[in-house]
Amino acid sequence: MSTTTSRTIHNLRGICSVAALGTATALATDATAQSGMNTTMLEESIYLEGLSDPWDMAFLGDGTMFFTEKCEGLSVLMPSGEVNTLLGMPEAEDSYPVAGDDLFCDGQAGMNGVAIDPDFDENRFVYVYSASNMSEPPTNRVMRFTVADDFSSIADRTDIVTDIPYKTEATDHPFGGTGAHNGGRIRFNPGDGYLYVTTGDNHNPEIPQSPTIMGSKVLRIDGDGNAAPENNPPEGFDPRTYTYGHRNVQGIAFHPETNTPIIMEHGPWHSDEITVLENGGNGGWDPRDNMAGRGDCPDGYCGYMPNQGEGMNRYERAAFMPMTDFETYPDAMPPIWTNNGWSQGTSSGTFVTGEQWGDWDGALLVGLMGIGFGGTPIGQRIDVIQLDDQLSVFDVTEMTLPMPSARFRSLVQGPDGALYVAVDSGEIHRLAPSGM
């Protein structure tokens, strides 16, 4: 039986406001967002409100929207406006027909990514990434469920990935609590049909370059959790590994023409990155101490060094602890964007397509949640990043928002062509070019 929540659905569009103009010049990794006017006028409406830390969204073609809340669970918004709760955390405030007794929320961990099987019409499968204490120590898992025909419930839980590490102990670092650097975005690539799973380093210096620990990786698997046969990791690596050597991948999107995977990743108080992935590639993140000219670091993890308690010049910090360490790993995948050297909480990204987007048709839209710590500008915004045929950045524009700035957690283009944006304050917003 479905459970309708008390949340409010708004179906009316908001007031029209200007977006940003896309004429700012930006070159490769030093691309810097500029504000201005633009030909794309955006309207905003609150699509869903009253949520608790909404984390991700996934749409069906008719507008049915699955969404997760980090400490609540999985729900589905029907085209009628009704919300059915499906899978809840044990301590969720709302009533859920199914409770995952082993699931939990802690720090950055909880119920994170959600993805819909490309063959949903035939198999009714939906996938969720969540922290679980079913094993000891706790891990992150990717779970598959079968959705009822009327979307009132889910059943047939199958854990297709069970061994993504979760940070079990606090460490002596900024933001060093349990559950940190947890990754969690999951997406199907429409080109190859595989599920891509992003994971984080847990503030553990051994994880990024480990061949067998599944943190700091992008996994490429089928719907049963098996490695894609085309994966080409280095010898000795877990065959599910598509790429490795990452810090904390928060977003992944696929180019609308080539289906090339592109990730968004938090930097270590400098240099958020966007990177075009290469099968078997190394992201170049290696925060171990006593290597690359570094000495001892707190708890053996140099990810916030040097001067981890204050805001050292970001370029000095980058020289000491590079996000992509080309000196140690000369063949590492180069980022195509580094946020002008800042770390401001790069999160999810999505490509938008359709003539309604004008010059932004085919652009990559990326949300930044903002940091504002140690002298870093907060930087809450959505950047419009335009790529050339070689997937290099040629222009970056800061979108002038028809809504207040916020912690932009998830960006997804809906089947209607609009942009849907989940923010930590508890809303999902719909942004659309004027007249849609």
Pin down the residues of each PLM region.
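Short hydrophobic/aromatic-rich beta-strand motifs
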Residues: 1-2, 66
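Gram-negative bacterial Sec-dependent N-terminal signal peptides
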Residues: 2-31
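Acidic, Gly/Ser/Thr-rich repeat motifs that build Ca2+-stabilized beta-propeller blades
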Residues: 34-206, 259-263, 267, 342-390, ...
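Short, flexible loop segments at the rims of nucleotide/cofactor-binding pockets, characterized by
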Residues: 43, 172, 238, 397-399
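Short, cationic motifs built from Arg/Lys/His that form the positively charged side of catalytic pockets
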Residues: 75, 144, 217-220, 407
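Beta-propeller domain segments
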Residues: 94-105, 109-111, 119-121, 191, ...
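Conserved RecA-like P-loop NTPase ATPase core
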Residues: 186, 249, 411
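Conserved blade-ending motifs and adjacent loop-strand segments that build the rim/top face
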Residues: 392-415
